[in-house]
Swiss-Prot record:
The keyword rRNA processing does not apply. Keywords: Oxidoreductase. It comes from the Bacteria. This is Peptide methionine sulfoxide reductase MsrA. The active site is at residue 52.
Length: 220
């Protein structure tokens, strides 16, 4: 475990779990709330980590312009990780919401701002009482504009940093990269029982760790 004997930390590749040869969810079902499928034409995708993915996914499936969401893992080493494997801290993945959106209805900037305002991006390897590298803050971009979008996300985060500092909060630790530049280079969907979890389990665990500090969208 990456934090068994001290503070959470990422593990070296030689110590990471080996994972599996096949996806844990090879045939995703239609979205339980939106009724949609992955891979819709005319859409774009952003991968967002803001702590426990159950509540985070609900936040985004309720966002106008978002046409599909799923939960899974990215940013780490282990291929095709299970939820239990990721919870050991030995995959280096973080919990992620895949957000597929119609860019004519909601913008990339708006989704980044929503993500930043919905959690505390200064907490490092935790969110509230949820501790571990799998809860770290992250934004991963994808598609032909991934590099430009990653740079734009950094600009938004840099715009937010002094506002958080003025509120007495620390340095932003959000990891921002094109998904293809992460160690595994992929997003791995979690098991079906985790998809749209709070729709299936309305009384399920749903922490919110917003700082209450507005971010806003800086000029491009």
């Amino acid at each position: 475990m990456g934090w068994l004997f001290g503070a959470p930390r990422l593990v070296e590749e030689k110590d990471a779990l080996k994972g599996g040869p096949h996806p844990v969810l090879p045939n995703p079902q239609p979205h339980a709330v939106l009724g949609t499928l992955r891979g819709q034409p005319g859409t774009e995708t952003i991968y967002i980590g803001i702590g426990c993915y159950w509540g985070a996914e609900k936040l985004f499936w309720e966002t106008p312009g978002v046409v599909y969401t799923s939960v899974g893992f990215a940013g780490g080493i282990t291929p095709n990780p299970t939820y239990r494997e990721t919870c050991t801290g030995r995959t280096n993945h973080t919990e992620i919401v895949e957000v597929v959106y119609d860019p004519t209805q909601v913008t990339f900037d708006e989704l980044v701002v929503k993500a930043m305002e919905a959690h505390d991006p200064t907490q490092g390897y935790r969110q509230g009482n949820d501790t571990g590298t799998q809860y770290r803050s992250a934004i991963y971009t994808a598609g032909p504009n991934a590099e430009q979008q990653a740079q734009r996300a950094r600009e938004i985060v840099e715009h937010y940093a002094p506002k958080l500092a003025a509120a007495g909060l620390g340095r932003i630790t959000t990891e921002i990269l094109p998904l293809a530049s992460t160690p595994a280079g992929e997003y791995y969907m979690a098991e079906d029982e985790h998809q749209q979890y709070l729709h299936k389990n309305p009384l399920g665990y749903c922490p919110h760790h917003s700082t209450g500090v507005a971010c806003g969208i800086p000029e491009a």
